[in-house]
């Protein structure tokens, strides 16, 4: 994959677990919409993430959505709406998004979605991180995923190495 758009949550948690550097190693272009930038600088955002965003690296592109967003996106928050819209506008290879409602709507709109767990799985497959350790760090944040999902990725990774 070369071009991905990200929603707020994946950037937030990858920064918190010190694995944000895998993104430019996995993807040629990593793009977020303006609303995601604003959410990552919001008052409720963890300090570590705000500090990282204040001087974010050049590989993280911030773009404004130009194409009008569809009415069906109105039920989502601004970051999700703009991330889906930008992924469509740019014909991105995928959208990194974890929120269930956003994932469903993105898929309904024809956008390929992956989540934070998949990004870490792909990073581990590329030798960029230890998957079990990354997942363990993620479990010590407020990130939530069903234990079966963690287990499925760990099993796939184990089979891949065998």
Regions found by a protein language model. Give the residues of each.
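Active-site-proximal, substrate-binding regions of enzyme catalytic domains
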Residues: 2-94, 100, 107-111, 133, ...
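Positions that flank functional sites
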Residues: 102-103, 121
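Short, glycine-/small-residue-rich phosphate/pyrophosphate-handling segment
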Residues: 144-145
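C-terminal structural segments of small proteins and small subunits
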Residues: 139-141
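Residue-level signal for short amphipathic helical patches enriched in basic/charged
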Residues: 97, 126
């Amino acid at each position: 994959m070369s071009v991905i758009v990200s929603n707020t949550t994946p950037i937030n948690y990858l920064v918190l677990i010190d694995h944000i550097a895998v993104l430019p190693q996995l993807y040629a272009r990593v793009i977020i919409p303006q609303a995601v930038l604003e959410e990552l600088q919001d008052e409720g955002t963890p300090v570590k993430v705000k500090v990282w965003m204040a001087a974010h690296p050049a590989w993280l592109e911030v773009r404004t959505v130009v194409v009008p967003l569809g009415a069906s996106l109105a039920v989502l928050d601004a970051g999700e709406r703009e991330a889906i819209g930008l992924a469509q506008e740019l014909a991105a290879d995928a959208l990194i998004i974890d929120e269930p409602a956003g994932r469903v709507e993105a898929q309904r709109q024809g956008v390929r979605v992956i989540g934070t767990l998949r990004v870490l799985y792909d990073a581990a497959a590329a030798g960029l991180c230890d998957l079990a350790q990354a997942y363990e760090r993620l479990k010590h944040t407020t990130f939530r995923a069903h234990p079966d999902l963690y287990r499925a990725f760990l099993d796939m990774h184990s089979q891949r190495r065998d």
